[in-house]
Amino acid sequence: GGCNLFDLDQLRMEYSPDEYQNLLMCEFVDDLASVFPLSELQACMVDSWEVWTDFHALALRPFGWREVWIGYDPAKGTQNGDSAGCVVVAPPAVPGGKFRILERHQWRGMDFRAQADAIKKLTEQYNVTYIGIDSTGVGHGVYENVKAFFPAVREFVYNPNVKNALVLKAYDIISHRRLEFDAGHTDIAQSFMAIRRATTASGNRPTYEASRSEEASHADLAWATMHALFNEPLQGESANTSNIVEIF
């Protein structure tokens, strides 16, 4: 008896504990510890088919020749459940306007060349003017391969200060209602809600981490989005020209 169409053990590998309970067991997620609370993220949700009249998801060039930015975050763990995240973000048409997450992808079991090829395909569909990549681990291979066809790619070398700058920028944008994504893409909200305040191993510096077990999701879509949003400086004016972000 009962439903035998799903492999619950496999689903537990693919989702973080919070995501599993919220998406599959219909339990409400406690967001008190999250940097990005659910209420803030709900304000970013729109019906993209109704609101984004200039975006046509099924077209050969979904956004025509308007510019977009790409953010990528590599898989950090060693288990099958860990995934890399990639987002296509439309920057504001006017200063202080809204960012829109047009596409998001999570890649599991793909080597760095396959992931770089997937990013290259996005550059053939969109007018990509910026790509930001965390070069940690597998990310370094992706970064080197992307650099071959997109030399201006920005490399993020993670440390607590870089994480702080990324989160600060994203929080400023989200809290001012300057980010939009489709309401059906609940994985984006889950990803941001997984980011919590923490301290470094020495215990004397604040940083941020994703709440996850080693085999689960690690907020890849949120970090990927932050790599794209960071192309707008904290002042929200013109893009920074440095190709490597490494702050000590």
Regions found by a protein language model. Give the residues of each.
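Mg2+-dependent endonuclease catalytic cores in nucleic-acid-processing enzymes, primarily RNase H-like
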Residues: A93-N204
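Acidic two-metal-ion nuclease catalytic site recognized across multiple nuclease folds
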Residues: R104, A219, M226-F248
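Structural motif
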Residues: N161-V162, S211-D220
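ATPase catalytic-site recognition across NTP-hydrolyzing enzymes
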Residues: G1-P74
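Gly/Thr-rich phosphate-binding beta-strand-loop-beta motif of the actin/hexokinase/Hsp70
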Residues: F63-P92
